A protein has these predicted regions:
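Aromatic-lined ligand-binding clefts that engage carbohydrates, nucleic acids, or primary amines
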Residues: 46-49, 53-68, 107-109, 193
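An acidic-aromatic loop/edge-strand motif
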Residues: 23-32, 108-218
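Extracellular beta-rich ligand/substrate-recognition surface
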Residues: 30-40, 80-89
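Positively charged n-region of N-terminal signal peptides that target proteins for export
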Residues: 1-4
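Beta-strand-rich ligand-recognition modules
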Residues: 66-124
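A short, structured loop/turn motif at beta-sheet edges
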Residues: 50-53, 97-106, 133-141
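Bacterial N-terminal signal peptides
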Residues: 6-16
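Short beta-strands within extracellular/lumenal beta-sheet-rich domains
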Residues: 36-48, 89-96
Length: 218
């Protein structure tokens, strides 16, 4: 019996250490998003009966993200390079309550997928976003109902290329292809958005365990 309790305590401790938990959110991406230096856009609209006092989001990506709520930038350059272990992923915890409102809320996320490794980054090999938002009154998770598409304005620049130690690519931005107002448009489908592809759930390969990032964001 004592051995059972020791194993149980160890399992709970390990789960806490690795950030293992059940979430509504699933790993999602556009169906054609798996090339190095890919920029992806995601949209989800929700209706809230009132503004929550607290609404904590767990957000994990490969590799970086920017988050807007109702057109207001809530997270600038979120996420860090993968590598809590050779196979696992970090996630951010952010209270989004200050950005939410009664009624309609528009969630928009831009994700930058490095798609290659460096001395400080372990690529999962698959572009992806996992988003989970929890409040006392509701839970919202990323799934196939989210709309997404690759951002057409971003591309890779010509040589010279970054040093092989870096996973980032040089960026080319063609303003002629920009999707102005994609964060708040009432009909993302008119900009080419379509339903996301579900890649897996929390803890599944290739992203594996998600570990909480022990940093505070402004």
């Amino acid at each position: 019996m004592n051995r059972f309790f020791i194993v149980l305590i160890f399992a709970f401790s390990l789960s806490s250490l690795l950030g293992i938990q059940a979430t509504e959110g699933k790993w999602i991406a556009p169906s054609d998003a798996n090339h190095p230096n890919t920029w992806m856009t995601f949209r989800k609209d929700i209706i809230l009966p009132k503004r929550p006092e607290k609404a904590v989001a767990q957000i994990a990506v490969d590799s970086k993200y920017w988050l807007w709520i109702n057109g207001q930038l809530a997270v600038f350059e979120g996420g860090v390079k993968r590598g809590p272990t050779p196979k696992d992923t970090y996630y951010d915890e952010v209270d989004l309550a200050p950005f939410l409102q009664k009624g309609k809320n528009q969630i928009a996320i831009l994700v930058w997928y490095f798609g290659k490794e460096g001395f400080s980054h372990k690529s999962s090999g698959q572009a992806g976003l996992l988003f989970n938002l929890e409040s006392r009154k509701f839970v919202l998770g990323s799934d196939e109902t989210w709309l997404c598409r690759i951002h057409p304005a971003y591309g890779s620049a010509d040589a010279p290329y970054p040093n092989f130690r870096l996973p980032e690519s040089n960026i080319r931005f063609d303003a002629r292809k920009d999707m102005t107002g994609w964060q708040t448009t009432e009909c993302p489908e008119t900009l080419g958005f379509s339903n996301a592809l579900v890649l897996g759930t929390w803890g599944e390969a290739p992203y594996n365990y998600c570990c909480p990032l022990k940093l505070k964001r402004a």
